Amino acid sequence: MISTDSLARIALDLQLGISHQDRFHRLIQSVRSLLHSDASALLRYEGGQFIPLAIDGLMQDVLGRRFALADHPRMEAIARAGDVVRFPADSNLPDPYDGLIPDHDDFRVHACVGLPLFSDQTLIGALTIDGMNPTQFDGISDEELRLVGALAAAALSNALLLERLARQSSEPLAPSTQNGPGRAEMIGRSPAMDRLRHEINVVASSELNVLILGETGVGKELIAKAVHQGSPRASAPLVYLNCAALPESVAESELFGHVKGAFTGAIHNRAGKFELADKGTLFLDEIGELSLSLQAKLLRVLQYGDLQRIGDDTPLKVNVRILAATNRDLKQAVVEGQFRSDLYHRLSVFPIHAPALRERPDDIPLLAGYFCERCRVSLGLERLRIEPRALQLLGSYDWPGNVRELEHAIHRAAVLARAEQGSQAPALECHHFNLAAAGAPSSSRIPVEQVAQQMTAGMGLRTATDAFQLQLIEQTLAAQHGNWAATARALEMDGGNLHRLARRLGLKP
């Protein structure tokens, strides 16, 4: 039985919160205490999935997981119910929190209540309440649970309203980019990520060129997508070009296009990336790898807004916003004569620094949870969790390859754990991760020979080969400080072939 005084105290306590996040934490802590549950979570509904906003009694990595309705029947049941949902202990719908309650990782959740949250008859989120005792919530009526849900819905609705008002008063997004699975989502709640989001919001609605600076694997393309999606050009194309993967012989054609007969093999007219991005955005990744001759031609397009296809003297007008990215120190490249100073100043009107993962270690559990859920879906697993000690190991590592290295480390660990444990609900343990000791330099990682021995156990030939190639490329890339051209030379590979292999293995977009 829930007393009116208890509900009133929750309502008053919510008013004391300094921020939305603080209020959310107060809410679920109060709910857990009031209902004597083992775990509770407040989730936002967006784009066909539930996104955790605040948790209590669950593993920290849950905050990074995304629960798509199509992949989680229990979450779908909550979304479609329209009222209190009580799942019986013997429900055949898998609980997404199984194995994610600390100190109960070997047990399945027994009692589960889901409260869909509505605002103006529109689903905006859910409150989930879980317990290890099958009869844990039998003494609480549906009406009492509805009152708890109403408090949660009011808190969430107010937060979403203020968020919309803030967005509309500053940098309105194109309607098609407000939500949905295709939008760019950056995982993390650290101060470094807050600063990054602020910089994106400041520049997105302008027409300024943006130079995204950061190490390999920090997510520079994701930042470019977020800038594009937040701009007035959001409904127009975002065209991607990796400058490091361009052989000099075809680079000009890729950028500016060519006409039939312009050179041997030009059997038809072909539009370049600038034409394809007309009225939209062109993202030039690894801009520092462009040759000086191409830099001069790129500068002309930025200055005058026109270009010429190879073999055609007729100028073409284009209206393109440039987003460029690099892991190089372009200022130093200018000093050394490897990059044009006038082009640098054209591109760096608004520089954005993408933080390295070691600059935001508090985000590692969230990212680990996010990648775990993606791996679970891609591998067709019932559940996938990370042991607490393994999560601590991930948090203590310096991640020279940044977020991309973390993503692939988790994917490899999931493959290894599944093969080793022969289970549809594997747990990732410390020995599944090929990481150096905490704080050790990246060169002290496990030798490739040892990695190969570990990875081939229980794997098919294709899986083992891919895993070995992935690890070898990652280690070489880290040793070459993220320079793909140097990595290709170290591996004695053609640069284009390396980029194609990296894309197939998921190392590059």
Curated annotation (Swiss-Prot):
Pfam families: GAF (PF01590), Sigma54_activat (PF00158)
UniProt-annotated binding residues for ATP: 214-221, 277-286
Pathway connected to this protein: Nitrogen metabolism; nitric oxide reduction
ATP-binding listed as a keyword: yes
Family annotation (CDD domains): AAA
Gene Ontology terms, MF aspect: ATP binding; ATP hydrolysis activity; DNA binding; DNA-binding transcription factor activity
Biological processes annotated in GO: phosphorelay signal transduction system
Superkingdom to which the source organism belongs: Bacteria
Transmembrane spans: none
Function: Required for the expression of anaerobic nitric oxide (NO) reductase, acts as a transcriptional activator for at least the norVW operon. Activation also requires sigma-54.
NCBIfam families named among the record's database cross-references: PRK05022.1 (NF003451)
Designated name of the protein: Anaerobic nitric oxide reductase transcription regulator NorR
